[in-house]
Amino acid sequence: MKFRTWLFLFPLLCLPAWAAAVDYRLPPNATPAPPTEGVSAEIQEQLTAGQRVTRGGRVPFCDVWLARSWTTQADFQPTAAVIYPFEAGQFLGLVRYARKGTDYRGQEIPPGVYVMRYGLQPVDGNHVGTSVIRDFVLLTPADMDQTVAPIEEKALAKLSAQVAGGTHPTMLSLRHVPEDASALPALRHEEEGDLWILETAGQSAGGEALPVAVVLVGQAAE
């Protein structure tokens, strides 16, 4: 019996890593309506059309709605560490997880609806190695975050920690959108770290397109 079990398992154990990996997709023409339960009317009014990410092409994983427009810092110049012209605590959009996910630190994100706000990773010894880029999306419970107004950084960190139920904010890493990126939105896979990155575009308050890239699946290397 043990020998037969081994014969059954052997082909599975020999599969290459890519064969066992979960595939995520961005189905065309999937524009889910934003949720209303637990989401304030103020936030609902500020959302664009939704973008759905699925597992394996059919199973919903999460839906993302960007804000209609983003306030940006005047005369902002990106650096190697800070690439987006946002202010800490700024409202960026909304995300709904149909099933549990994980943030960039590996913390569990329960199914639910969360407000997306901009945050900057502190420059201190507690965050060495997490990411060279300090730009992050911090998630907050939608039923506890009812305004599009900015939130003070310490209050945001405390509120965001409630998503994962720990002491650290629940955070998704922001990345560069490649210069050769063609049509947006798109879902890009980075084999190193097995990251799935949503590349999409919002717009500034002045009407200029502002591409962004957020890691929806995957976490920092330990």
Which role fits each region the language model picked out?
Residues 7-16:
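Bacterial N-terminal signal peptides
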Residues 126-130:
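Short consensus segments that form the blades of beta-propeller domains
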